[in-house]
Amino acid sequence: MTDKFLEVDYLVIGGGAMSAAFIDALLDRDRSATIAIIERRDRLGGHWNNAYPFVRLHQPAAFYGVNSIQLGKGGADLSALPEIQEYYHKVTKRFEKSGQVSFYGGHEYLGDNKIAPIADPENITTFKVNKRLVNGTYMAVEIPSVHPPKFEVADDIPFMPLNDLITQYDKWEQFYVLGCGKTGMDAVLFLLRNGVAGEKIHWVMPNDSWCLDRDYLQVGRIMGTVLEHSDAIIKNDKAHKVFEQLERVGGIIRIDKAVAPTKWKCATVSPEEMAELEAVQNRIRKGRIKRLTRDGIEFADETIAFPQAALFVNCTADALAAKTPTPIFSERRIDLQSVFFCQQVFGAAAIAGLETSKCTDKMRNWIKPVPHPDIPSDWPSMLTTTLDNALKLHAFLPLWMMRSRLFYMSHDPIHVYLANAVKAFVIAGRVRRAAKKFPRTI
């Protein structure tokens, strides 16, 4: 066993998008801090290094990535995988150029400030951490290409992750897409756009979800969307009524108006994409799969046969799980979490802003985590916490908020920005009181 000892101000576990956003913001506000990044992969970018080839951002590139480097062409642009991977290469170069950041790719964090190369686990390095350990893995993203199914699959079943679909879509007669989250939607859209007829696609949907309409999450429109959602929470006392009102006024959509969704995961699609998805009528709603064999797809109460020449596409990873929140700041530790609904990278950058502000951890923890939602009744408390956090962050970091490209309001003209800030202040208390009508699950 080899022991080495190094000293660093911040030891960051994980090199994904949230860690990158945190480090980028920290570098802008602390020109002397030293940072070590510990990452199992060889590159920054986290799950983007394992993403399926045809993936695109689900929300505008204008407010994704890190504060210091623009991504995409602005506006409604949705960057594709090659551009995103090149972007994180640029981020890496920025970190290297600073002279403040050391990247330990291909390393495992062992706990107790110790790391070791995955290829040489006996070669241990121990860090003296002067300020904080930063946990960039708390959100525990499940990556579709490497996440095994939660059910038994017989060895003779043609079963593959979504990543392989690009080489297999023209070799099979029938397709079974397993999973109805955003990954499952992307799989169905890929097949349809590559000439596979809708009747050849069988979509196993354990549940239906409400989705965000991407048209309402564009630069200049998001705050209006937040206010519409706030109004719906104030006016209704049941979660399904909130979403039905939002569906009527615009901003929330679902694949089948005859089915009441039981899930809400922040999946973002356009009305045009939703119209394409509606072309797939072979929707199997039998709950979760228990077992997949040549005898059929086994559910709790029924087994369904399938054709011999059928390919099964695994889209069952819970990419954005509803994690139990924990205080962001604790003694000598930071757990990176969202502080705005469905906006992880902004949250990480804002946490760096708080870390470098002149206040106590008790004050910093006035900013509460906003966990990813799972069911519709999670939404009122999520939106309430988002509004409260926005107001508190403006008190802590007013100029930083206005200048942060990751904060969606920063793209608005100053008079619109200020007007929306006033509206948020006026409505926040009413939303907070109204949210108490809804049960909380997270």
Outline where the language-model segments fall.
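C-terminal active-site-capping segments
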Residues: T386-I442
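Short hydrophobic core segments
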Residues: L11-I13, T126-E142, Y176-L178, P307-D318
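Glycine-rich dinucleotide-binding loop and its adjacent helix/turn
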Residues: G74, A80-Y87, N135-G195, I201, ...
